[in-house]
């Protein structure tokens, strides 16, 4: 009986394990590439955006856009008298 006694399924299992390892490595490389690309896009948009005095910028992926226009708090902040109603 030899030390290298292989069954027919050993080669199939080895090929499957190698393919899974190659796929995992490819997914890791693709994920890193996409992450770096998103960082580059986010950085270029941050440099192009203009921020007024006292305002803070939201992170790129957390900015929510609305078709209705500015929110109520921002409109109230822009009016000179504030949100109170005068009669």
Curated annotation (Swiss-Prot):
Keyword set, alphabetical order? Membrane, Mitochondrion, Mitochondrion outer membrane, Phosphoprotein, Transmembrane, Transmembrane helix
Question: Which residues are modified to Phosphoserine?
Answer: 49
Q: Where in the cell is it found?
A: Mitochondrion outer membrane
Question: Residue ranges, Cytoplasmic compartment?
Answer: 32-87
User: InterPro entries, from UniProt?
Assistant: SNN_cytoplasm, SNN_linker, SNN_transmemb, Stannin, Stannin_sf
Listed GO molecular functions? metal ion binding
Q: Any transmembrane segments, and where? A: 11-31
GO cellular component labels: membrane; mitochondrial outer membrane
Q: How does it sit in the membrane?
A: Single-pass membrane protein
Which domain of life does the UniProt lineage start with?
Eukaryota
Q: What is its main location?
A: mitochondrion
Residues on the membrane's Mitochondrial intermembrane side span 1-10
Free-text function comment from the UniProt entry: Plays a role in the toxic effects of organotins. Plays a role in endosomal maturation.
Family per UniProt?
Belongs to the stannin family.
SUBUNIT field: Monomer.
Protein name, per record: Stannin
Q: What is the organism of origin for this protein?
A: Bos taurus
């Amino acid at each position: 009986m030899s030390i290298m006694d292989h069954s027919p399924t050993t080669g199939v299992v080895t090929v499957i394990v190698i393919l899974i390892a190659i796929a995992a490595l490819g997914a890791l490389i693709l994920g890193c590439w996409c992450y770096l690309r998103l960082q580059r896009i986010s950085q270029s948009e941050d440099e192009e955006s203009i921020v007024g005095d006292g305002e803070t910028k939201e992170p790129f992926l957390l900015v929510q856009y609305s078709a209705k226009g500015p929110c109520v708090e921002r409109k109230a902040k822009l009016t000179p008298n504030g949100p109170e109603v005068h009669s």
